[in-house]
């Protein structure tokens, strides 16, 4: 804020407008491995990314064929939480599934 004197010996505060920019977005990406069952990947995509079965299957096939598949794009905190949830669930189930986040 800037202080601007006016003509009557009083002070008026002038508020400067701040330009807000949208938050940085991050892709959550599943990486292929030779051990995690395809059905487990589909279940993870449905549970943590709220995709229907058909979409989850398409993402799983992309991971299987191309080595990686994007599950969604989120703000940093949400993407980080989803990565942590997926990796934790995979480890608890005994699978080496990898999930990472990348700047979109």
Swiss-Prot record:
Can you supply a Gene Ontology BP term from the record?
Answer: proteolysis
Q: Organism, per UniProt?
A: Burkholderia multivorans (strain ATCC 17616 / 249)
Oligomeric state and partners? Binds to the N-terminal domain of the chaperone ClpA.
Upper classification of the organism = Bacteria, Pseudomonadati, Pseudomonadota, Betaproteobacteria, Burkholderiales
Q: Which Gene3D superfamilies match?
A: 3.30.1390.10
Gene this protein is translated from: clpS
Q: Name one Pfam family in it.
A: ClpS
Q: What's the protein here called?
A: ATP-dependent Clp protease adapter protein ClpS
The domain of life for this entry's organism is Bacteria
Q: What does this protein do?
A: Involved in the modulation of the specificity of the ClpAP-mediated ATP-dependent protein degradation.
Q: Which NCBIfam families match?
A: PRK00033.1-5
The Swiss-Prot or TrEMBL record describes its family as follows: Belongs to the ClpS family.
């Amino acid at each position: 804020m800037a202080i601007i004197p006016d003509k009557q010996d009083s002070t008026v505060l002038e508020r400067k407008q701040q330009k807000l920019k949208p938050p940085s977005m991050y892709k959550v990406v599943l990486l292929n491995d030779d051990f995690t069952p395809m059905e487990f990947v589909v279940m993870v995509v449905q549970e943590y990314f709220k995709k229907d079965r058909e979409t989850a299957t398409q993402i799983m096939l992309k991971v299987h064929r191309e080595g990686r598949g994007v599950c969604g794009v989120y703000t940093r905190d949400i993407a980080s939480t989803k990565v942590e949830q997926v990796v934790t669930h995979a480890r608890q189930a005994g699978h080496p599934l990898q999930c990472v986040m990348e700047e979109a």
